[in-house]
């Protein structure tokens, strides 16, 4: 995913992307502010279907930041056990979701990811 880093805070960065704005832990070396980076994004919270992961009625992929929490809306590509593969544009992301067996492919889901449980790792600087 291509992101533009807007701000570097003590614990996390604030970024913007074609999907919206978010906050995450930076898992790379030095960065340039402002700076653009191609990154891998990971959501590492404990997700449980029906408790903090739900179907979405909004058929679009987005990231928004509200009170330090990333709100993710994404399309389900596939499910393998408790691993849900989602897309944000051309980017494919695996998220572990307990009870994922009831989720259907090609539907959109919504979940929250606190900034401290979201990480971005640059592919190159």
Give the location of each predicted region.
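Structural detector for short beta-strands of small beta-barrel domains
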Residues: 1-8, 58-81, 107-111
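Flexible glycine-rich surface loops and low-complexity tracts that mediate binding to linear polymers
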Residues: 3-4, 34-48, 74, 104-123
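Short aromatic-glycine-enriched beta-strand elements
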Residues: 10-14, 81-86
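Acidic (E/D-rich), amphipathic helical modules within compact regulatory domains
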Residues: 10-55
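Beta-strand/loop nucleic-acid-binding surfaces
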Residues: 18-32, 88-119
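Short, compositionally biased
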Residues: 50-66, 122-125
């Amino acid at each position: 995913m291509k992101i533009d880093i807007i701000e570097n805070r003590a614990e996390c960065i604030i970024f913007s992307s074609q999907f919206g704005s978010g906050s995450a832990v930076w898992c790379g070396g030095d960065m340039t502010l402002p700076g653009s980076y191609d990154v891998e994004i990971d959501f590492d919270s404990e997700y449980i279907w029906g408790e903090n992961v739900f179907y979405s009625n909004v058929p679009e992929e987005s990231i928004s930041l509200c009170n330090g929490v990333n709100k993710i809306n994404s399309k389900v590509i596939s499910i393998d056990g408790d691993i849900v593969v989602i897309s944000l544009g051309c980017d494919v992301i695996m998220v572990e979701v307990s009870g994922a067996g009831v989720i259907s492919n090609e539907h959109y889901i919504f979940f929250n990811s606190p900034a401290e449980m979201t990480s971005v790792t640059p592919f190159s600087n």
